[in-house]
C-alpha cells in the first residue's frame, strides 16, 4: 500500500463555539484510490467536529488530502472507511434526492490563492483581523499574540519567523 508522508491539518477558530450545535462531524474518515498494490491512501482516519458558526480551514501540503477531504464533506466522493455525520445524524447521500437535501444544508467557500491575501498586509495583520472578527476584540495583546502563534504552529509555521518578532 502506497502512503504519502504528508500532514493534513484542520484548523478551526474556536472562540465561543463549544456550546453551539454540532453541524458536521466525522470519525475515522478515510479515502483510498487505486487497486491492488497501487493503492494510495489519500485521507487517513480523520476525526473532526465543526459547530454552527465556526470558520474552518483545511490546511496542508500539496497532496496531503485537502481536496479529497473537501469532496467527501460535500458528498462529491464517498469515503472508503469511517462515517460523516450531519446535524448529529449519520449522513445519507445514497440517492440523488438525499444528496440534494444534504446540499441544501451545507456549503463550501473555496479560496482563490491569488486573491486571498493582500501582499501588502503582514501575516500578523491578517491573523489579528481574524481574531477580532470572531469575537476576540476584547482580548489582551498578549492573548492575541498567543493565539496567532498557536495558529501558525498548528500548520507547522513559526509566527516569529513570519513576522520578524
Predicted regions and their residues:
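Conserved ABC ATPase "signature" region
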Residues: 142-161
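The feature captures the beta-strand-to-loop junction immediately N-terminal to the Walker
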Residues: 59-61
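Conserved Walker
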Residues: 67-68
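Q-loop/switch helix immediately C-terminal to the Walker
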Residues: 112, 119-133, 147
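Helix-to-loop junction immediately C-terminal to a conserved catalytic motif
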Residues: 74
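Conserved ABC transporter NBD signature motif
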Residues: 82-92, 102
Amino acid at each position: 500500500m502506497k502512503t504519502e508522508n504528508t500532514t493534513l491539518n484542520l484548523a478551526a477558530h474556536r472562540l465561543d463555539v463549544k456550546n453551539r450545535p454540532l453541524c458536521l462531524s466525522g470519525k475515522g474518515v478515510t479515502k483510498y484510490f487505486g487497486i491492488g498494490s497501487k493503492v494510495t491512501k489519500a485521507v487517513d482516519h480523520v476525526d473532526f467536529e465543526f459547530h454552527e458558526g465556526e470558520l474552518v480551514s483545511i490546511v496542508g501540503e500539496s497532496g496531503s488530502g485537502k481536496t479529497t477531504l473537501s469532496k467527501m464533506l460535500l458528498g462529491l466522493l464517498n469515503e472508503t472507511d469511517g462515517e460523516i455525520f450531519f446535524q448529529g445524524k449519520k449522513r445519507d447521500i445514497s440517492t440523488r434526492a438525499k444528496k440534494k437535501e444534504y446540499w441544501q444544508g451545507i456549503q463550501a467557500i473555496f479560496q482563490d490563492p491569488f486573491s486571498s491575501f493582500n501582499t501588502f498586509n503582514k501575516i500578523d495583520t491578517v491573523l489579528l483581523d481574524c481574531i477580532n472578527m470572531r469575537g476576540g476584540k476584547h482580548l489582551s495583546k498578549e492573548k492575541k499574540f498567543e493565539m496567532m502563534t498557536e495558529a501558525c504552529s498548528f500548520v507547522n509555521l513559526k509566527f516569529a519567523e513570519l513576522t520578524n518578532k
